[in-house]
Amino acid sequence: MKQEIKPATGRLGVLVVGVGGAVATTMIVGTLASRKGLAKPIGSITQLATMRMENNEEKLIKDVVPLTDLNDIVFGGWDIFPDNAYEAAMYAEVLKEKDLNGVKDELEAIKPMPAAFDHNWAKRLNGTHIKKAATRWEMVEQLRQDIRDFKAANNCERVVVLWAASTEIYIPLSDEHMSLAALEKAMKDNNTEVISPSMCYAYAAIAEDAPFVMGAPNLCVDTPAMWEFSKQKNVPISGKDFKSGQTLMKTVLAPMFKTRMLGVNGWFSTNILGNRDGEVLDDPDNFKTKEVSKLSVIDTIFEPEKYPDLYGDVYHKVRINYYPPRKDNKEAWDNIDIFGWMGYPMEIKVNFLCRDSILAAPIALDLVLFSDLAMRAGMCGIQTWLSFFCKSPMHDFEHQPEHDLFTQWRMVKQTLRNMIGEKEPDYLA
């Protein structure tokens, strides 16, 4: 059934938590450069991908649904460091100076607002550009005012808030996360052990009718309290943890093994990474949050309860090592021990020398544009159709997450078809 989608009129504010970080600045530079014809938005589904229509015609996704034009985006956000986007991008050393200079004026105009930050949630970071708030509730109120002020100052019709900041320490789901009333009480009581800064950003965004995207593996909007609030406010939420490198490869390879009914004995994964994200993950408490996210992938694809002979005893290990000389150029190694006909063993080795932020930047942009589309289409709560972009896709307690990349891609296209009242094409015709 065709949905009524409000047109993408006016300007869209994109407020990024961690706007001075490597992923954020890479996304911003690429978007601005694309607007000026200085670069192509390679890796962006919203800008380059096509989908087949009911009549078997192939169309660009951006021609099928009314996405916000890149020219209508206004960037802003928060950071614990005061550097403008040009200075921050120079520090990150992801992009060449000549690429930054093409949009230097626009980058220098993007100056971060003081961040809502608690050192206890990211002990390896020591920022100075930080809000002073007596309670988590006061922190929320300050963030809400920031959103309102940015929207007014930049004449934005709509806003999306994107978390592209560091991974917070691991915490389990607790009673304070189980209902909106309990969450708000914990914020007002300043329960800093269970209410993270990222939860304050998410609450503030939803309260201001802004879709929220969680790009890290933090426990944040994947709680009953946030589900309740997002449905109450009719706001989309999505995440979590950008699926950009090693885990992307896993969600391609694991479905292949399962489709061919090849068994797996073990999967060992390790990485070296030298950017600020790697530095934060060098702390065991922060790494555990990431580890849980990365480990969750293959079980739901393999379904060992259905195929115990093939996947009933898979040894899965994930490691991330902070190695400053590599900076943003992450290297990932995977050793996969598989077995085939009559149980004979084989091995697959994958060595992925990737650029972390180059892979994550288009994911961040696509999640922003699709979240804005979902808001205009009246879709609220968890956006499971955006699982394609995430390591640890959000889901409620009644459902399992979908990790198979190809099934996830079909979910994206089918959701877009449903929005415009299109049927899936007949691939047998």
Curated annotation (Swiss-Prot):
Q: Which UniProt keywords apply?
A: Inositol biosynthesis, Isomerase, Lipid biosynthesis, Lipid metabolism, Membrane, NAD, Phospholipid biosynthesis, Phospholipid metabolism, Transmembrane, Transmembrane helix
Among Pfam families, the record links this protein to: Inos-1-P_synth, NAD_binding_5
Q: Which GO terms describe its biological process?
A: inositol biosynthetic process; phospholipid biosynthetic process
Which Gene Ontology cellular component terms are annotated? cytoplasm; membrane
The answer to whether the entry has keyword NAD is yes
Q: Does the keyword Membrane apply?
A: yes
Identify the domain of life. Bacteria
Would you identify the family this protein belongs to, as annotated? Answer: Belongs to the myo-inositol 1-phosphate synthase family.
Q: What name goes with this protein?
A: Inositol-3-phosphate synthase 1
What is the source species? Answer: Bacteroides thetaiotaomicron (strain ATCC 29148 / DSM 2079 / JCM 5827 / CCUG 10774 / NCTC 10582 / VPI-5482 / E50)
Taxonomic lineage of this organism? Bacteria, Pseudomonadati, Bacteroidota, Bacteroidia, Bacteroidales
